[in-house]
Swiss-Prot record:
Encoding gene (name): efp
InterPro entries (alphabetical): Elong-fact-P_C (IPR015365), NA-bd_OB-fold (IPR012340), Rib_uL2_dom2 (IPR014722), Transl_elong_fac_P/YeiP (IPR020599), Transl_elong_KOW-like (IPR013185), Transl_elong_P/YeiP_cen (IPR001059), Transl_elong_P/YeiP_CS (IPR013852), Transl_elongation_fac_P (IPR011768)
SUPFAM superfamilies, alphabetized: Nucleic acid-binding proteins, Translation proteins SH3-like domain
The keyword Transcription belongs to this UniProt entry's keyword annotation: no
Compartmental location: Cytoplasm
Entry's family note: Belongs to the elongation factor P family.
GO annotation terms (biological process): peptide biosynthetic process
Organism: Salinispora arenicola (strain CNS-205)
One example GO MF annotation: translation elongation factor activity
Name used for this protein in its record: Elongation factor P
Claim: Cytoplasm is one of the keywords in the record: yes
Amino acid sequence: MATTNDLKNGMVLNLDGELWAVVEFQHVKPGKGGAFVRTTLKNVLSGKVVDKTFNAGTKVDTATVDKRTMQYLYADGEDYVFMDLETFDQITVLGDTVGEAANYLLPEAEAVVATHESVPLYVELPTSVVLEVTYTEPGLQGDRSTGGSKPATVETGATVQVPLFITTGEKIKVDTRDGRYLGRA
């Protein structure tokens, strides 16, 4: 149990039986009336974002989220199997829980899996990964590094916009947060 004065970005709250992560918060002290805390909360399971206002000092129930580094093993249908690197236990994470991270997951890649009471909540990848381009249209002679971009399919099946000079078989660095091309690897 904590108060609204203790809120931090990333903290997970248990409100009405649902888990909500604090995306943003602001303490407001108006000239007239009592202080309050304006928050933006994201539902950990559904991804829904809401704005909620609390009176300052209100008690809120915090949830314990366990973050562990795990190794991605394989896809099992629409689900993904990870192995805990310390205990070697395997857990299955639903495809909806993995979300967009699936576009950048390679077997044996490490990721942080957050759980609450042994239920996987979300998967965090490193900010960038190195992937091999499996297909892209050939560039034309005279292509420059300052030119436009073209779509390229990487080994995970995701499509990334790359500069015209990138060819099939090259390894590129991709930002996992937004899928941007960062450079050659």
